[in-house]
Regions:
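Phosphate-binding site of ATP-dependent enzymes
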Residues: 169-223, 267, 271-279
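Glycine-rich phosphate-binding loop of ATP-grasp-fold ATP-dependent ligases
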Residues: 146-173, 194-197, 217-238, 373
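Peripheral (often C-terminal) accessory segments that flank ATP-dependent C-N-forming ligase machineries
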Residues: 137, 305-402
């Protein structure tokens, strides 16, 4: 099978690894920043010229993809960039297609639409306390803190506003807006909560939740000036009683959106409060950027799960206790201890690059001279962790107040 993958930064990396391991499959992919890591694993990255063609306007992208499919006998088109969901409309009947439909992509690119779906199915959402246009004279003024600023109908990250200085900075950066008449809304910030993530697969009108987690500290990096989320964050499993409630609420949402079509992986972020309530916050209709998770299944099982029987995903994740360890260094020029992944059979991170035969965190994972990445796998041995801690200068993030 020949695969063309069009993704955001490395968010299908671990799925592509499964395809590239087999002589049955040939993988082509776009890329961001560098190509050395992917190429080392037999993932054929597009030329710089062809990679740039995917940044052109819609009609030219469709034309390029159509030519590429024909010239390279592509059997499977995998698209995780929600701004290119129009490719689903054009190619869904021509090749096997993994990715959201145009309607589904709006769940990520149109935050009001995603909130409306939640409200429709009885899932709580934070209150909207202000709306307007970025060009309005009162943008980000007269707020009570903390609060969250979100674009209403265009794709851009939410901004946590913790104090007046954050709001002033947001106003200062308004000149960067391409479309000042775009709408925004200010959402209440739920203080008494833990941030939860739910990961899922939708295929052929059905869905399965693969895993859940609690993430601590990421919200502090989602400020006016977005920071690298690896720094200062910590991930751990949800407590069983919390997991039960989160999955129950997630089911309501997933039952609705699975009717909208598409075959894709996704996740959403929610807030669980001390009173046992869960609030829907945001949706991604693709795997996480620079944070893909091992699939725990072969490439052929992955394809069968997407197109024939979604229970392949259920079986793959059964009894999997996923661990996600954030690891950082204060010097981004220090070599990453890649050899220990081979030694202890631990899944490799996805945001590395290779320079002179050595592994380093890619530019996407660096900030202020430091860097970080994430190690995701099940049954990560204590010996692996111990050897990194005792023989390298890399450090694992610790649970705050843990």
């Amino acid at each position: 099978m020949n695969i063309l993958n069009i993704q955001l930064p490395k968010n299908h990396f671990h799925a592509l690894l499964q395809f590239s391991k087999s002589n049955e499959h040939k993988v082509y992919s776009n890329w961001h920043g560098s190509t050395s890591y992917e190429n080392a694993y037999n993932i054929h990255t597009l030329s710089a010229v062809n990679n740039d063609k995917l940044k052109l306007k819609k009609d030219k992208v469709i034309s390029y993809v159509e030519d590429f499919i024909n010239e390279n006998n592509i059997d499977l088109l995998q698209v995780s960039d929600p701004t290119k969901a129009y490719l689903h409309t054009h190619f869904k009947d021509k090749v096997k297609y993994i990715g959201p439909t145009e309607d589904v992509s709006r769940l990520e690119t149109d935050k009001i639409f995603a909130k409306e779906i939640a409200n429709k199915v009885g899932v709580k959402t934070p209150a909207i306390i202000k709306t307007g246009k970025y060009s309005d004279s009162d943008y980000c003024k007269n707020l009570t803190f903390p609060a969250i600023e979100k674009p209403s109908h265009h794709w851009a990250p939410a901004i946590n506003l913790f104090k007046e200085a954050d709001a002033e900075k947001a106003i200062e950066l308004l000149y960067l807006k391409d479309n000042p008449d775009d709408e925004y809304f200010i959402e209440e910030y739920i203080n008494d909560m833990i941030e939860t993530n739910v990961f899922f697969v939708v295929a052929n009108g059905e869905y399965r939740i693969t895993h859940t987690q609690e993430i601590i500290g990421e919200n502090l990096n989602k400020t006016v000036e977005q920071k690298v989320w690896y720094i200062g964050s910590y991930i751990k499993p949800l407590k069983p009683e919390v997991d039960t409630i989160v999955r129950k609420e997630a089911d309501k949402y997933l039952k609705e959106i699975s009717k909208m079509g598409g075959n894709y992986e996704g996740s959403f972020c929610g807030a669980y409060t001390s009173t046992g309530e869960w609030y829907f916050l945001e949706m991604n209709v693709r795997p996480d950027i620079l944070n893909s998770t091992p699939t725990f299944m072969s490439a052929n099982e992955y394809v069968k799960g997407m197109f024939e029987d979604i229970s392949y995903f259920e079986k793959a994740w059964k009894d999997i206790n996923i661990q996600k360890l954030l690891i950082t260094h204060n010097d981004s020029t220090v070599e990453y201890p890649f050899h220990l992944h081979d030694k202890y059979s631990v899944a490799i991170p996805n945001n590395l690059e290779i320079k002179n035969g050595k592994y380093y965190v890619s530019d996407y994972g660096t900030v202020d001279g430091g860097c970080g990445t994430i190690i995701a796998d099940h049954n990560i041995s204590k010996e692996f962790i111990k050897e990194i801690e005792e023989t390298t200068t890399w450090t694992f993030n610790k649970e705050p107040n843990g």
